[in-house]
Amino acid sequence: MKHLLSIADLTRESAVELLDEAERFEQALLGREVRKLPTLRGRTVMTVFFENSTRTRVSFEVAGKWMSADVINVSASSSSVSKGESLRDTAMTLRAAGADALIVRHPASGAAHQIAKWTGHQDDGGPAVINAGDGTHEHPTQALLDALTLRQRLGDIEGKRIAIVGDILHSRVARSNALLLSMLGAEVVLVAPPTLLPVGVSAWPVSVAHSLDAELPGLDAVLMLRVQAERMNGGFFPSQREYSINYGLSEKRLALLPDHAVVLHPGPMLRGMEIASAVADSTRTAVLQQVTNGVHMRMAVLFRLLVGAEEVAG
């Protein structure tokens, strides 16, 4: 695997190997007074974010530093992009500066693929490119950490019924999770108003429903999504209040879930809209576990791309 741009870059076997690798990194760090492994010593990892981020950017930076990499954060607002430099020139500059890995978030779908194409393969000195979210396309490492969290909470993903609820249309998280969870044997159902479903969703490996209340009793997990108002230029639903009434996860709706079911959210959460504060803070919600798993999962991805399928270094 040269890059991680899409869930399509993975097979079921390689996805499970990454989940296992993440848990090995978690174990390797347990009990260490200094959370450092020498695995990526001498490697240069650059995070290049053209959109705001807290969880993804920070967890990639922590992952790189815990593996002893030199981590450099390239902010679009303080780079030559703000002066009109093209994405290609920026990417080639970072390659020339010695990046071993480029972790890219960009508002345009396909941006990470283009950067990987421009900068070349590792075989000819190019960096590994990791898609940290490209427009409404994909966010593969988020799906991987969500799958890891589900596996830890549910024991196995095979045969589980998992709902992805909310703004499917604008969500790269929904796309990556639908592909990965289906690959791992889950039954995935998308729950959203018709206006927030993408064209062509019938080709996805999922079923579609419009009533959240009807789905909750039969679920093993529910992944709540934020309404991405910043990507909307029209009326996709009458009001925030009506959206919350129909698709928000309230305490009453939480009680409809089976006792073992778990609630996930990729963040940031809009409390009071897609999820009630009491639900967000419930022990049945795995939001902080997702963040913790995000660090270990991204350690695994960096390791696989830059080192290969070897044992975790001491």
UniProtKB/Swiss-Prot annotation:
Per the UniProt entry, what are the Gene Ontology biological process annotations, in alphabetical order? 'de novo' pyrimidine nucleobase biosynthetic process; 'de novo' UMP biosynthetic process; amino acid metabolic process
- Gene for this chain: pyrB
| UniProt source species | Rhodococcus jostii (strain RHA1)
- List its EC numbers: 2.1.3.2
Q: Which residues bind L-aspartate?
A: K83, R172, R226
- Gene Ontology cellular component? cytosol
Keyword match Iron: no
Q: Which Pfam families match?
A: OTCace (PF00185), OTCace_N (PF02729)
Q: In which pathway does it act?
A: Pyrimidine metabolism; UMP biosynthesis via de novo pathway; (S)-dihydroorotate from bicarbonate: step 2/3
| Highest taxon listed in the record's lineage | Bacteria
| Annotated catalysed reactions | carbamoyl phosphate + L-aspartate = N-carbamoyl-L-aspartate + phosphate + H(+)
What is this protein's record name? Aspartate carbamoyltransferase catalytic subunit
